[in-house]
Swiss-Prot record:
Protein name: Chorismate synthase
Pathway noted in the entry: Metabolic intermediate biosynthesis; chorismate biosynthesis; chorismate from D-erythrose 4-phosphate and phosphoenolpyruvate: step 7/7
EC class (word): lyase
Record's signal peptide: none
Classification of source organism: Bacteria, Bacillati, Actinomycetota, Actinomycetes, Mycobacteriales
Originating organism: Mycolicibacterium smegmatis (strain ATCC 700084 / mc(2)155)
């Protein structure tokens, strides 16, 4: 079973990603992880932190000479701003005099839309700092690090690549054209908003500029595409084994994500059954389809079509023109605390959604095919693909 977790706070010394259950022999380097972390910092509308934030990647365990060893993998991402926060975020007790600085003032005015309020009440904190430090989307950098290993496994074992693009930002008209292919990823990353379509890009930029002028923030929708998946990852046998339920849970677990859909998702509910599904036809190598409304999943299993997962991100909760709240110490009306933030982080969210999709797909592949090494997993995959090909119905010549 592939398992992952992260540790660390937004302004702590470092973030740490742990990945357990990865087979031996998967090629991975610190440079590859750094490249994915750089993609996470992309996007028009990001705040000042992205300009000076540097992700210092250190492989702590589980990798030797560029290959995974089969044991737990630990990856550290250092915080270049740690010296500014060393007293405030020190794990050990510090002299109270050292804490007499502005950035350590108690944060008692929770931000609507954030974890501050519920976290303070649940854990008994009189300050939102312990909540916001862990709840921060900075934590996703560690997920991206772990997900880079999963991406490498999918590429080497199955020839599968995962990409994302932004569908819409704010009220911009959603892109509704064909899904991009992996060969389009470089052009997508070159777009200021990671859009596949130039006309959509211009509308998104206009939305961000308007929000910036108004002292506001924006959310949006991203789509992740994974092509080349074999038929049969996941299962129909129980809800927890359905791949769509696993994908939805993983993506919904990303900070600020408020909705997930597979394929055409909610739009499918508006259609009649006769035009909602992907009809099948005999082809030279088995079943073929002319549509992919299901997004590559039927009955909780991959069906050989490209996987399409969309995620809706809410507007960033830290609004420059602070929202109304209540001071948790005095009980009086107040305006929410304002931490340094972005106007829009939707382009970066796409990279994080890619990460979670890659981790779930890698787990599903390892559950299906097993193996202790990449070579063994590949052999198991080849055997399965041969068996599936034999079961495919042969196309009949029309009379």
């Amino acid at each position: 079973m592939l398992r992952w977790t992260t540790a660390g706070e937004s302004h702590g010394r470092a973030l740490v990603a742990m990945l357990e259950g990865m087979v031996a022999g998967v090629p991975i380097t610190s440079e590859e992880i750094g490249a994915q972390l750089k993609r996470r910092r992309l996007g028009y509308g990001r705040g000042a932190r992205m300009k000076f934030e540097q992700d210092q990647v250190t492989m702590l365990a589980g990798v030797r000479h560029g290959l995974t060893l089969g044991g737990p993998i630990a990856i550290e991402i250092g915080n270049t701003e740690w010296p500014k926060w060393e007293s405030v975020m020190s794990p050990d007790p510090v002299d109270p005099a050292d804490l007499d600085v502005a950035r350590n003032a108690p944060l008692t005015r929770p931000r609507p839309g954030h974890a501050d309020y519920a976290g303070m009440l649940k854990y008994g904190f009189d300050d939102a700092r312990p909540v916001l430090e862990r709840a921060s989307a900075r934590e996703t950098a560690a997920r991206v690090a772990a997900g880079t290993v999963a991406r490498a496994f999918l590429r080497e074992a199955l020839g599968v690549e995962v990409l994302s693009h932004v569908i819409s930002i704010g009220a911009s008209k959603p892109y509704d054209g064909p899904a991009p292919q992996f060969s389009d990823l470089s052009a997508i990353d070159d777009s200021p908003v990671r859009a596949f379509d130039k006309a959509s890009e211009e509308l998104m930029i206009a939305e961000i500029e308007a929000a910036k002028r108004d002292g506001d923030t924006l959310g949006g929708v991203v789509e992740v595409v994974a092509d080349g998946l074999p038929v049969g990852l996941g299962s129909f046998t129980s809800g927890e084994n359905r791949l769509d339920s696993q994908l939805a849970a993983a993506v919904m677990g990303i900070q600020a994500i408020k909705g997930v859909e597979i394929g055409d998702g909610f739009e499918t509910a508006r259609r009649r059954g006769s035009v909602a599904h992907d009809e099948m036809y005999p082809g030279p190598d088995g079943v073929v389809r002319s549509t992919n409304r299901a997004g590559g999943l039927e009955g909780g299993m991959t069906n050989g079509q490209p996987l399409r997962v969309r995620a809706a991100m809410k507007p960033i909760s830290t609004v420059p023109r602070a929202l109304a709240t209540v001071d948790m110490t005095s009980g009086e009306e107040a305006v929410a605390i304002h931490q340094r933030s972005d106007v829009c982080a939707v382009p970066a969210a796409g990279v994080v959604v890619e990460t979670m999709v890659a981790l779930v797909l890698a787990r599903a592949a390892l559950e299906k095919f097993g193996g202790d090494s990449l070579a063994e997993t590949r052999a198991n995959i080849d055997s399965y693909l041969r068996a599936v090909a034999e079961r495919e119905p042969a196309a009949q010549a029309s009379s």
